[in-house]
C-alpha cells in the first residue's frame, strides 16, 4: 500500500544529498514470531537536518504503516515534519496524519512557517484535520492545519497520493525559505524544544502498543526510546 510513498519520500531525501546512516543495532529490521509482520527502518543524514527517520511496517492485509519524522538542524527553528500513515486492509480503513509540527504555538512563529500547510489544508478537504486526534493535545507539537483523515479506500487511492506529494513539496519549500532567514529561536532553545518533543511523544505514542503486540515489549521499548524518540531516554 505505502511502498510508492516510501519510494517518493526517500528519493526526495537522496535528491537533497541525503546519506543513509546506521540504525541502532537490532532495530533496523525485525520480524514477528509468527512471521506475519515485518518492520524496517532507515536513518538519514540530510543537509539542513540533524536527523531524519523513516519506518515501514508490513503486516499484510491486517496493517500497513509508514512513519517519518524530520528534525531540522538546531540553528533552524522551523517545524519538524511528521508523517504517519496507517492502512487496515481487512477493514478498508485509512488513518493519515501529515503535519508541520511546530516547536512553539505563538502567532509570529505560526505566521512565518505555516502558509504552505494552510494552502494544503484548503486544497484537500478530505484531509482537513477537523476530527481531532485522540492521543495527542493538538495545541502542543501539532498545528491547526495538519492534514488528518480517518477514511477508506477512496481517500487512500485518490486523495492521499496527491496530498502526500504536495505535502513533501511544501515542506521542502518551507525548509528552503527558513534556511535563508535568521531564526527567531536560539539554537539552544531549539535543541531543548526538540528534545521535549521526543519526551512528549514517547509518553503518548499510540504506536508503541501496536509494535509491542507484533514484536514484543523488550524490542518495542528499545525501538521507542533508542530510535523513534532518542531524547526520551533517561539521562
From Swiss-Prot:
Please name the GO terms of the biological process aspect recorded for this protein, alphabetically: phytochromobilin biosynthetic process
Keyword check for Oxidoreductase, yes or no: yes
Source species, domain of life? Bacteria
Q: What is catalyzed by this enzyme?
A: 15,16-dihydrobiliverdin + oxidized 2[4Fe-4S]-[ferredoxin] = biliverdin IXalpha + reduced 2[4Fe-4S]-[ferredoxin] + 2 H(+)
EC annotation from Swiss-Prot or TrEMBL:
1.3.7.2
Q: List the GO molecular function terms.
A: 15,16-dihydrobiliverdin:ferredoxin oxidoreductase activity; cobalt ion binding
Q: Which InterPro entries match?
A: DiHydbiliverdin_OxRdtase, Ferredoxin-dep_bilin_Rdtase
Q: Which residues cross the membrane?
A: none
Name the job this protein performs: Catalyzes the two-electron reduction of biliverdin IX-alpha at the C15 methine bridge.
Q: Which PANTHER family match?
A: PHYTOCHROMOBILIN:FERREDOXIN OXIDOREDUCTASE, CHLOROPLASTIC
Q: Which family does it belong to?
A: Belongs to the HY2 family.
- The name on file for this protein is 15,16-dihydrobiliverdin:ferredoxin oxidoreductase
State the species of origin. Answer: Parasynechococcus marenigrum (strain WH8102)
Gene, per the UniProt record: pebA
